């Protein structure tokens, strides 16, 4: 069986989920290819598109949120003959039995292609945040793999039958799902995703580092400026650049301070590491943060004026509270359906036969 996973590098979350999904499917002896969809449909302006995105989320989040909400209510995708031919060439060369989308733009374009050119194409989509807006939805999708029951309800409210929705969480590397090592007392991981972006953290870290019994591992991602800023600055801090071994640091930590990204959320859940969320400012992050609060698996700072450092220190001194958060994470894990696209595809083939 051949599987083609289409994604995009808006941040690193969607791409990371795709690589994790590839790892999972290859364990089922499936041939899997992960493709940045923007390499295919917009090869000449891809770099510009990503540069604008990175600028907006770091400097102009209000403008980003405006465009996010606009696209959330639209299934429009500019589709012309050139784009159709590029998609057709990709699908033909991949010889894929299944196409999986982990990014809504991919979902829009492949749904349009399927509707107009190839009704038999199997199209599955993995939604990589708790909130599922309309840009993820299409009648051409054969199966939705979603993060939570909350996501499932949102999909059903858009007219999708529950039989086409599987609650499996968001894909993470298998290492996050393996047995958890003993947590290190007062170990904190600070990370802002692959781009290493957490605004206004300097003051908080400065106060935390005054406590010699606290150790912080700062995962700077691809943010070289952040890496250089904190390298060798504090004796009780370890700074790590971009790494594929986030699980090593997260699984031994008592707490992770981070943004409310969907991938990081489920990495923390599988690691049973309580989450401390700095003020969420992107629309999809707000939905993830509300999920964290509702399920009591972490703390969300909504107001920038809050005394974050003192709050973190008090949380580390509250083992019962941290243990309760870990128990809630385990309950969320237990609710996830144990299935994947290979099993679903096999069931559909049997049904057709």
What are these regions (language model features)?
Residues 20-92:
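Conserved N-terminal ligand/cofactor-binding loop architecture of enzyme catalytic domains
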Residues 115-167, 172-175:
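Active-site-proximal region of nucleotide-activated glycan assembly enzymes
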Residues 162, 175-190:
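Nucleotide-sugar donor-binding and catalytic loop/hinge architecture
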Residues 183-252:
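Donor-nucleotide binding loops and adjacent catalytic segments primarily
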Residues 251-261:
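Acidic donor-binding loop of glycosyltransferase active sites
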Residues 294-296, 304-321:
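C-terminal "capping" alpha-helix adjacent to the active site of nucleotide-linked donor transferases
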Residues 314, 321-335:
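A short, well-ordered alpha-helix in the C-terminal region of glycosyltransferases
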Residues 335-353:
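C-terminal alpha-helical cap of glycosyltransferases
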């Amino acid at each position: 069986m051949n599987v083609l996973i289409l994604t995009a590098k808006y941040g690193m979350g969607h791409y990371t989920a795709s690589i994790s999904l590839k790892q999972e499917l290859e364990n089922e002896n499936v041939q899997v290819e992960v493709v940045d969809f923007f390499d295919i449909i917009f090869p000449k302006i891809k770099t510009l598109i990503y540069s604008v995105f990175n600028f907006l989320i770091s400097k102009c989040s209000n403008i980003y949120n405006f465009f996010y909400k606009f696209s959330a209510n639209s299934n429009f995708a500019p589709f012309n003959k050139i784009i159709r031919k590029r998609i057709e060439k990709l699908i033909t060369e991949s010889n894929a039995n299944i196409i999986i989308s982990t990014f809504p733009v991919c979902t829009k374009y492949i749904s349009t292609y399927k509707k107009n050119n190839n009704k038999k194409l199997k199209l599955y989509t993995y939604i990589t945040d708790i909130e599922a807006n309309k840009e993820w939805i299409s009648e051409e999708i054969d199966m939705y793999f979603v993060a939570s029951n909350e996501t499932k309800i949102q999909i059903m409210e858009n007219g999708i039958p529950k039989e086409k929705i599987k609650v499996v969480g968001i894909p993470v590397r298998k290492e996050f799902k393996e047995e958890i090592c003993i947590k290190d007392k007062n170990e904190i991981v600070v990370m802002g995703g692959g781009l290493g972006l957490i605004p206004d953290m300097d003051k908080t870290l400065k106060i935390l580092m005054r406590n010699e019994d606290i150790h912080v591992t700062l995962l700077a991602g691809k943010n070289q400026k952040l890496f250089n800023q904190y390298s060798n600055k504090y004796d009780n801090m370890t700074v790590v650049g971009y790494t594929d071994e986030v699980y090593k640091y997260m699984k031994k930590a008592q707490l992770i301070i981070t943004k409310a990204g969907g991938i990081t959320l489920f990495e923390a859940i599988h690691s049973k590491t309580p989450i401390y969320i700095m003020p969420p400012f992107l629309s999809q992050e707000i939905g993830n943060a509300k999920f964290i609060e509702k399920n009591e698996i972490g703390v969300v700072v909504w107001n920038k004026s809050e005394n974050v450092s003192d709050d973190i220190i008090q949380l580390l001194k509250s083992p019962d509270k941290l243990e309760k958060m870990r128990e809630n994470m385990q309950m969320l894990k237990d609710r996830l359906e144990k299935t994947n696209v290979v099993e679903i595809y096999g069931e559909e083939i049997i049904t057709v036969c």
